[in-house]
Regions:
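Bacterial lipoprotein signal-peptidase II cleavage site
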Residues: 21-32
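Early extracytoplasmic/lumenal segment of secretory-pathway proteins
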Residues: 37-115
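A bilobed periplasmic-binding-protein/Venus flytrap-type ligand-binding module shared by bacterial periplasmic
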Residues: 164-171, 212-214, 296-310, 329-330
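A ligand-binding cleft/hinge motif common to bilobed small-molecule-binding domains
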Residues: 114-116, 262-281
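Periplasmic-binding protein-like
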Residues: 231-237, 245, 280-303
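Conserved C-terminal helix/tail region of periplasmic/extracytoplasmic solute-binding proteins
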Residues: 364-398
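Mature extracytoplasmic/periplasmic domains
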Residues: 300-371
Length: 398
């Protein structure tokens, strides 16, 4: 039976459990009057912003933020950044709100931290400030992901994600075209295929959420009652997997060193590690026939209790970040390929370095695949946590 680290899954599950068990408190979300009191077009004086990243998002957006501060010192005098694991986010924000001292002005988060804050009503209502943010001309799949924020967050980057697989062509001359072919290959080559704990891996999570579409399960949105084929498949595949990696980087290392020959991947995870030299350039990416992309996005949220002046600065910043010129920076080094959440941001608008990385380490067919196959948003975070728990008990723990 494969071993697996369940730390992140446990943390996410605990966060949701705490949410469900917490008694209501009049101070649980700090000053909720933010959405109703007047926010000026610009701060009364330049403000410093404290930005917390729990999603690795700064790799994509810090250039946008830093340029805004340099261009608009009359709005933002200084930006300070910090990072934390997503499972710690809700507790950190709630503690500041209950103390009446909100020190974090904006959070960059994935769906996990977004949902934990929604459950505890930690995030300010951004829908009342839509005129200040503008109306981003989102790509349709990004618009669907934006809805997960329920008006209390702003999608700032997007990518179709996967599921894709990555392999050594010298060891896998005939890559699989279906999950069944992958299972057959794994059976013939035990311990040579690997994916990471879905709770702590984008490729692992996308593989888990993409299988119900590939296998024709009853309800891809319901891991508990609608994934019979997926759970049966993963239990069978489990027989031929040696160890479930604790995170995606571990699978990349194992592929690079020849410990395994095929792993699950995404567009960004295929491009970026090869560009960084941690995975040999010779590795190839593949997709399954008739796949469905399971999309992903990252968000900016503002804690309740932030001052009107700081909210004004954040709104100006978000308006800036969602312009096509700034969105082009999201191509980065392929980390979230493509990256932009809004329409009409071709690679030709990206910085020269980004264009070179994608040209040298990307896959020309990626754009074809993105256009060719349907796209569905990720599960809600609550449903993801249920899926992680079921995977731990029914697959990794069997």
């Amino acid at each position: 039976m494969p071993s697996v680290q369940r730390l992140v899954a446990a943390g996410l599950l605990l966060a949701v459990t705490v949410v469900g068990c917490s008694a209501p408190s009049s101070q649980s979300s700090g000053d909720k009057g933010q959405s109703t009191r007047k926010v000026p077009d610009k701060p009364s004086k330049p403000v410093s912003l404290e930005i917390l990243d729990v999603a690795g998002n700064l790799q994509l957006t810090q250039g946008m933020i830093d340029e805004f501060q340099k261009t608009h010192p009359e709005i933002v005098s200084k930006v300070s950044y910090s990072k934390a694991p997503a499972p710690e986010l809700a507790g950190k924000i709630k503690a500041q709100q209950q103390a009446g001292r909100v020190q974090i002005d904006m959070v960059l988060t994935g769906t996990d931290g977004l949902a934990a804050g929604l459950e505890q009503d930690l995030w300010a209502d951004m829908s009342t400030h839509q005129d200040a943010i503008g109306n981003p001309d989102y790509l349709p799949p990004a618009a669907e992901m934006a809805k997960l924020a329920q008006g209390k967050g702003t999608a700032v980057v997007y990518y179709p994600s996967g599921p894709l697989f990555e392999y050594d062509p010298a060891k896998v001359p005939n890559p699989p075209k279906s999950p069944q072919q992958l299972l057959d290959w794994a059976k013939a080559h035990p311990k040579r295929f690997q994916y990471a704990d879905p709770a702590n891996s984008g490729p692992g999570r996308t593989w888990l959420m993409g299988l119900p579409y590939l296998l024709g399960d009853k309800d891809p949105s319901d891991p508990e009652k609608g994934w019979d084929k997926t759970w049966a498949y993963l239990k069978e595949l489990d027989k031929y997997v040696d160890v479930y990696a604790s995170g995606t980087s571990e699978t990349m290392k194992n592929l690079a060193t020849g410990q395994v020959d095929m792993i699950m991947s995404t567009t960004g995870w295929y491009i970026n590690p090869r560009a960084l030299g941690t995975v040999p350039k010779k590795m190839k990416a593949g997709h399954f026939d008739d796949m469905t992309w399971v999309t992903d996005a990252q968000y900016a949220v503002v804690p309740n209790g932030v001052s009107a002046d700081k909210m004004s600065a954040v709104l100006n910043l978000l308006h800036w970040m969602l312009t096509p010129e700034q969105q082009a920076k999201a191509y980065d080094d392929g980390y979230f390929y493509p990256g932009p959440a809004v329409k009409d941001v071709p690679l030709s608008m990206a910085p020269a370095k980004s264009q070179q990385v994608v040209k040298e380490y990307g896959v020309p067919e990626f754009d074809t695949w993105i256009d060719q196959f349907p796209k569905k948003p990720s599960l809600s975070s609550q449903a993801q946590v249920k899926a992680f728990d079921l995977w731990n008990r029914q697959v990794a723990g069997q």
